[in-house]
Amino acid sequence: MNKFRTTMVAVAAAAALVGLTACGGSSSSASAPVEGDWDAVVAAAKEEGSVMLYSSQKPANLDALTAAFEAKYPGIDMEYVRGTDSEINPRVETENRTGTGIADVHMTTDASWIENAAESGKFSTELVGPDLDAPAFDPAASVINDRFFLTSAAVFGLGWNTAAVPDGVSTPQDLIDPKFQGKIGIVNPTGFASYVDLYKYYAKNFGEDYWNKIAELSPRVYPSALAVAQALTSGEVTVSPMVQPLVTEVAAGAPVDWALPDKPWGTPWYSEVLSASQHPNAAQVLANFMVTAEGQQALNGGYAAVLPDVEGAVARAQDIASPDIAELTPEKVEQYSQEWQTLFQG
């Protein structure tokens, strides 16, 4: 099976749908995993032969997860579609409504969506993997309604191009400097609950007028933190107050570096096994693998991991507080998005 990995979720999902149709896939939602022990689920997963993940995680980490999963389960091909939460979540809803599941496992940071979906149980099936009950995973603190499980957490900090800013920066306030006019990279939060929370957090912790001062420096706006990291690497911008730890980029020799401020902002990813999955057993196997030591090391270089002592992780995901969803209702996200557009795009 040919793999595809892209940030263009609509294109990728369409391609997957064509492939599913060509293989004679059913248009109705699949059943629950087989009855029996975990070995029976794994055997059934190998019979299904493939699994699809929708995620807003970093492509390099999703590539690493794919390689690690396929090494552990060579009989199961893993594919993923990478997109933002605002792209992926509506597709999950559509696939659930139509019963034509493309995704098998869904990984998102949208706290409001997670809470509502976990409460309704509409989109997911109960988890059965043994590692989701492991004491090191701390299921009491990591699983919501036996449907959503903590998988990772993004921690945001400061990033800079080492050629342009050899001394780096250490606080978000360091970016408020005329020398960075037109060279600051920021993420457009429009429609993204997580990024709206980030902007509000910075204003609360680094000054209510922080973003007004940044706006005066004519920052360059990007659709995601990944795009900001790429712009830092190319030198299109020289600093950013909002990047995920640039561990992968530094390891690859890119001219960038990063640091966490004293009060870094973070947001957790939760995942679910989708009820519209056409590969219900493979979905459970992938979900379980994601919380094993191998899965966590692959997925969380530069991120917070759900297990202790994971090489490459920068924090423990259980220590990253979830956003206050009362402040992230669709109405409040829309209101803040409009305020942001007025400030930065006038």
Residue ranges of predicted features:
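C-terminal motif of bacterial Sec signal peptides marking the signal peptidase cleavage site
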Residues: 18-22
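Extracytoplasmic ligand-binding site segments that recognize negatively charged/polar headgroups
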Residues: 52-66, 78-96, 100-236
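A ligand-binding cleft/hinge motif common to bilobed small-molecule-binding domains
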Residues: 112-116, 237-257
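A bilobed periplasmic-binding-protein/Venus flytrap-type ligand-binding module shared by bacterial periplasmic
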Residues: 157-164, 199-200, 267-282, 289, ...
